[in-house]
Amino acid sequence: MNPAHLLVLSAVCVSLLGASSIPPQPLNLLQFNYMIQCTIPGSRPFLDYMDYGCYCGTGVAGHPVDELDRCCQTHDLCYSKAEEQPKCSSLLNSPLMKKYSYTCSGGTLTCNDDNDECGAFICNCDRAARICFAGAPYNKENKELDIATRCQ
């Protein structure tokens, strides 16, 4: 075999082995992003809500700093309840991974009847959070808080 071909083949194999250790992307968070965009046109959920307050994004500590942060806390609690459901306990059915179906028309979101028990539960968590987000003011001063001092 040509040494150049062998080098390319080796690089491809190493790349594939490396890619196999990359965890799957959270599919549900992408759906949740679309849900929010559907009901809050012009929003940028990943940018706007990631690292907001004490509960939006990866934070889960302390007291919510405002109404929007309380929405995220409630959403986190709903996901925790979903994980306690037997049908949602596996990795593929976890709240961050489980895909579900929904429709959005004129800003109204409906979780579809074809969802299984776990999908329906998670869809309703996301739907309730989306409704909460739509009614909560966004305070720029609560974006990228110093969690160590503000979220005790």
From Swiss-Prot:
Cofactor: record remark: Binds 1 Ca(2+) ion.
Subcellular location(s) per record: Secreted
Tissue note: Expressed by the venom gland.
Keywords associated with the record: Calcium, Disulfide bond, Hydrolase, Lipid degradation, Lipid metabolism, Metal-binding, Secreted, Signal, Toxin
Keyword Hydrolase in record: yes
Record: residues binding Ca(2+): Y55, G57, G59, D76
Catalytic residues (UniProt): H75, D126
Family of this protein: Belongs to the phospholipase A2 family. Group I subfamily. D49 sub-subfamily.
Protein's name in the database: Acidic phospholipase A2
